[in-house]
Amino acid sequence: MNYTLETADRALGAFPALLGAAFAHDSLFAAHMWVLFFTLVVSTLLLLRRVSFLPPVAGPPCRRTEYFDEVVKYGVMATVFWGVVGFLVGVVVALQLAFPDLNIAPYFNFGRMRPLHTSAVIFAFGGNALIATSFYVVQRTCRARLFGGNLGWFVFWGYNLFIIMAATGYLLGITQGREYAEPEWYVDLWLTIVWVAYLATFLGTILTRKEPHISVANWFYLSFIVTIAMLHIVNNLAVPVSFLGVKSYSAFSGVQAALTQWWYGHNAVGFFLTAGFLGMMYYFIPKQVNRPVYSYRLSIIHFWALIFMYIWAGPHHLHYTALPDWAQTLGMVFSIMLWMPSWGGMINGLMTLSGAWDKIRTDPIVRMMVMAVAFYGMATFEGPMMSIKAVNSLSHYTDWTIGHVHSGALGWNGMITFGAIYYLTPKLWGRDRLYSLQLVNWHFWLATLGIVVYAAVMWVAGIQQALMWREYDSQGFLVYSFAESVAALFPYYVMRALGGLMFLSGALIMAYNVTMTILGHQREEGASKGAAPSLQPAE
């Protein structure tokens, strides 16, 4: 591969970015176009180092039957990088809440850093993990090379360009004000193009498969890709004020805008953070423990029940609002129904270890994956419980919800991703094993303790917060002002930052471990604690 076409594409793309910066109708659009221009110029210069202008050397025809793993390698590295960045920004945001003087206006205040954190963790860390693992899994389970040639490269680089544009936009103050859908219209259009290419690559690989059976992991990955495309397009329907400006107006307003937003927001959780990562679970846990999926029939029931029910659950985010009561109740009912298929999937994941339970003790990667499934079960019980109106009246708008989200995002999505990265890295780079399994063990305990501290503190803080808000005296006046309720949360916010710092420390250990594995180093280690002793001849 001589990278000539890829280099030309980036060089040509820099030209319209330069024109956009020159003729922009507002300073924010001009600044964003300069960011795009310099990003494309730097990537062009980096690729120029690998371009070969020599004619191809005659030789035997190149075989294109091997798996296309180079893009998966880059996906793994991007996942690790964005994970560390996202967790670091999360710790900064947590400290800003505890110590407001750390807010640096205008670019690094809480209002701009918070969406940077959520997008970095969900879309940069989680999205790159999903793209990398889906490209790896679909090739192995279909026994076919990734479809589309260099289309896989376009998906990877195009998606990461979206991440850069979205992140810099947040710091500049460019936002639609829609949670998890903050990027403005032109960034949304770019993501749509990339996502269609992603769908074509993944679906094309399935259609050209040499394996007659389609793995259940691919069903979950495909549902995530298709549904996210639908959600993204509908929720981001907007009319730009100018094609050379950042501002746009949504196609929806009022309660319709709220319902569309949380139809998107909840199903981003349901399909981006659940269905896609279940694809990981159904492939990597059986591979790591060397056992088949416990019940393939249960996995199919899990899939179709999840697909049918999740899409209806969004209105539970809008209890006690202007949304019609029947819609709120509908969202609550489907949320409660979701508990059954979710726990069916959890049981299926855990029972896959049947006959290999000892690996929880001896293999820290398996331990990490099992902990992920346990957090999946906990989060999918807590979510339906919080959707019940009586419970929601206490939990809504409080830090309890923040604790719930992080127990799922860090415990489920984070842990299963870490396990997948530890599985993939030695295989992709042809190493015998990871640099250090003891470091994996350290990562596991730091991450687990960090999540437990974070979630438990937020549960307590949220309940205290809610009870202070609804405390009335005998005359019907509020006992506590809002400022008093905020001041009471200070020790909890410090503890939350500590939990986040522990989780970040684990991610830094992972980054070091993965880097050393890629470089080909191996740390000399004795048997890990808890490992079964080797058999000795009878005396």
Swiss-Prot record:
The chain crosses the membrane at residues 28-48, 75-95, 118-138, 154-174, 187-207, 214-234, 265-285, 298-318, 330-350, 368-388, 402-422, 443-463, 498-518. It is an enzyme of class 7 (translocase). Disulfide bonds: none annotated. The keyword Translocase applies. Heme b 1; low-spin binds at residues 117, 406. Binds 1 copper ion per subunit, denoted as copper B. Binds 2 heme b groups per subunit, denoted as high- and low-spin. Gene3D superfamilies: Cytochrome c oxidase-like, subunit I domain (1.20.210.10). InterPro entries: Cyt_c_oxase-like_su1_dom (IPR023616), Cyt_c_oxase-like_su1_sf (IPR036927), Cyt_C_Oxase_1 (IPR000883), Cyt_c_Oxase_su1_BS (IPR023615), Cyt_c_oxidase_cbb3_su1 (IPR004677). It catalyses: 4 Fe(II)-[cytochrome c] + O2 + 8 H(+)(in) = 4 Fe(III)-[cytochrome c] + 2 H2O + 4 H(+)(out). Cytochrome c oxidase is the component of the respiratory chain that catalyzes the reduction of oxygen to water. Subunits 1-3 form the functional core of the enzyme complex. Co I is the catalytic subunit of the enzyme. Electrons originating in cytochrome c or a quinol are transferred to the bimetallic center formed by a high-spin heme and copper B. Belongs to the heme-copper respiratory oxidase family. This is Cytochrome c oxidase subunit 1 homolog.
